[in-house]
Structures are given as C-alpha cells and as structure tokens.
Amino acid sequence: MTQAVMLQGTASDVGKSVLAAGLCRIFYQDGLRTAPFKSQNMALNSGITPDGKEMGRAQIFQAEAAGITPDVRMNPVLLKPTSDRQAQVVLMGKVATNMDAVSYHDYKPRLREQILAVYNSLAQEYDVIVLEGAGSPAEINLRDRDIVNMGMAEMAQCPVILVADIDRGGVFAAIYGTLALLHKQERDRVKGVIINKFRGDVALLYSGIEQIESLTGVPVLGVMPWLDVDLEDEDGVALQNDKYRGNAPRDITIAIVQLPHISNFTDFNALAAQPDVRIRYIRRPEALTDADLVILPGSKNTLSDLAWLRESGMADAVLQTHRQGVPVMGICGGYQMLGDTIVDEVESGLGTQPGLGLLNAITRFAQDKTTTQVNATMSGELPGWLAAAAGLPVRGYEIHMGETVLQEGCCTAMTLQKNGCSVADGAVTADGLAFGTYLHGLFDSDAFTRAVVNGLRARKGLTPWETTFCYAEHKARQFDLLAEAMRQHIDIDKIYTIMQQHQEPV
C-alpha cells in the first residue's frame, strides 16, 4: 500500500517546492522509500537525468533530498516558456513541440492517461509519494482541464495540504478564498494548512488560526518560520527575493546578468555558497561597476535576450567592463551571445544576427536538442584567472539546440567524454578575459570553483583560500536543517495520520 500526500499552494512561490523537499527528507530519514512527483512543471530551471532526460530542477533537488537518483517520471510534463505566449513542451524528458497557451489547454486532456500511468509506475516502487501542485488550485478558469492540482489529486486519490505564504500579507484571506473557490469534493481533499515564511512571534497568529479553522473546518498543521537555508528555487520569481540581492560584503563580487528569459540560474547556487563570494543578479548597466567577473547565463530565447542586452544598454556596459580588464563568462545561451555570429532558423526565426564579438565563434541552431550529463576535463593550459583550473576534472550537463564552431584566435576550454568519445567544448581567448561553455552545473565541481575564485582573488592581490568548499555536503546539511525545522514547527505525526487514512492500493 503506497502512501501519498500532495502540497498545493494559495499562489506561486509560497514555498511548495521547498516544503515538499523537506517532507521527502523527513520520510527518507524515517526509513521510507520516497519519491517526489509533479505532473506538470513550468520553469526555465531544468536538469538532466543520468539517462539524458530533461526534467524540472525542483523535482531533481527533491529527489536528492529523498536520497534517490532523479527519474524523469517524477516530472513527466515540463513547459519551458520561449516567449510571453509560447512554450516548449517537454514530455517524458524529450522535446515534443512548441505550443501557445490556448493550444496546450486544449491538448492537456490527452496527457491524463500517460500522467496516471507514470504516477502508478512510481507508486509501485516507493513507500511514499510526495506530490506538488503548481500555482493555485483556485484557478477556476483552468479547472475543467486541470492535470496538476486537484485534477492530479483526484487521479492519485491522495489528500492535499494547502501551503499559504504569510510574508506577502493577506494569508487568512488567501486560505479562505482558495478553499471557498474549490468544489466540495475538492475541498474535502484538503486535510490541513501550513502557514509558511512567518517572521516574528507566532503567538500573534493564534487567534487568527482559531478563526480560520472555525471558518473552514480545516486544521492548521503548523507555522513555518522564515528559514535561513540555502536551497534551490524553482523559477524566476525567486530572483526578486532578498536572497539574490547580494548586499553582504565579500572579497569577490560576481555579476550575473538577469536576462528576461534566464534559464538554469541554479548554475550559480554553488558560487553563492562560497564564503568569500557575493553574487548579484543585475539588469542595469551601472550595476556592473564593482564586478570582478561578469556572467551571461543560459537563456531560453537567445536572440530575444541578446536584443534586450543591446536595447537596455547592458551590451555596451558588458563590453566596456571587458575592455577595462574584467573577465566575462557565458554559459549555454550566454556562451552563444559572446560569439561573433548566431544563425537561428529554429528558436526565434530571426535568422543571422551578430553576437557581442568577444569570442571568435559562430553558432548555428538546430532542431535536435542535446540533453546529456557529462564528465569533462579542463584544457591543460588555461590563461589568466583560469590558469589554476587547467587539467581539472569537472561534471555537468548540456541542454541546448545549437552548435558553436570556433574560429581563429579561440582555444577549446575543455574536453567532454560522451559515448566513449572525446568532444571539445567551450572557448577561451588568449588572455582569458572571455570564456564560454555549454556546460551547466560547472560550479558544482568544488575544485574547479575554488580554483577560479582563487584566480579572481589573485587578480585583486588577495591571498588564495586553501580550503575547498564541498557543495554536496553543504546541500545535505541544508536538507537536514529544513527537515529539523519542519519537525519542530509542523505536526508531522498528523501528516502521517492523514496519509495512512487515505492510502490507496496501487
């Protein structure tokens, strides 16, 4: 008998993903084989499974919290917005098509059978499934074809816990309004509420909790405080939070350009965790003034974001910063932008466009998407701030639909091992001031990250740090801290009871 519980929210970014990861960690600590599941995820942060399938980063870090290898079945449908009106539809880890919102809404009913089959296959292998909804179940305009909130809860026949964010204000109205907009059979599935992100004396909430419980008949299972834990965020909404403003004084400042279609900003979590590094996401040219390194991150619409760089003045600012001797790095879409030319007949239909010209390279987009985990070795000789990283092993993953060919004056940055073959990747200039790669997750390689940060320290006349920060151990500690806080502030025994009362045979 498989047990399951689903976290749904009163809105986006209320903390569902993190609390789901915390439940995965708790059940893992308690000896239960646990898997996360989100039927449909809309995010530009994605990752690659060991078998080369693309899935949402949220379910990847939830799987890590549960002590298991990420499996694409944990996120069978991934939507990656390419513009305000279109998204790339990824089914079971592979690109299916591009659709606008109306077309996808009409298409969703066809996915129900596949989603349920995938869910049931997971349920046969695990003791507990922790499901996560998307946005809010009270989107009444989408109810009839829902496959991710109450529609998924109905398919899985599982109880629901509603998560509400008190930090944004109006928490009791959000709880009451969400429950009021549900149909009775949907409301009956909601067995508890968690109030999340509270700051202050919880005693001030007691009278409100009593009233909301009386009004709705749904118990509040706990009040989670605002936690100082370093865990991944699912989407770009999180870039507006204090966590990414980077005001704390540190020896090294790294400026990451916040592109309109930024993807995989989880690439920089390991950098942000370094004790001597401050990262800042920037959108204004003047914010580049104190940067020791500028990074152009991944993008889901490379040419559109390149046009934004020029229109906003950021392109000129990046080039001026580079002329002043500050290194500029690009990852995936950012790497493509650093080149001389981009030929795109696939993603944007804009044809041939000039890049920023910092790397003598030409990128041509293709229909087929490369999705693979890889081991790599940095080139044996690297210039400037990258010198200490020469020859180091690194790991990462590729998600791209283009091929970049180097021209005269560019050297290969690293060699990938793919299907038993050595494949060149990335580019670096002779002075090391421009460096690009397709490899996401590069900074999760501890020795590489410490080497390049020490290279930046040396440029400022600072003593290198001899101690290497272990990011994997750091993440494990964060999962344990989250689980400890949830055990302290949430009635976990009640959640066990809720699951046991509603467990279903698979």
From Swiss-Prot:
Pathway: Cofactor biosynthesis; adenosylcobalamin biosynthesis. The gene is cobQ. The keyword Cytoplasm does not apply. This is Cobyric acid synthase. SUPFAM superfamilies: Class I glutamine amidotransferase-like, P-loop containing nucleoside triphosphate hydrolases. GO terms for molecular function: ABC-type vitamin B12 transporter activity; catalytic activity. Catalyzes amidations at positions B, D, E, and G on adenosylcobyrinic A,C-diamide. NH(2) groups are provided by glutamine, and one molecule of ATP is hydrogenolyzed for each amidation. Pfam families: CbiA, GATase_3. The active site is at 332 (nucleophile), 440.
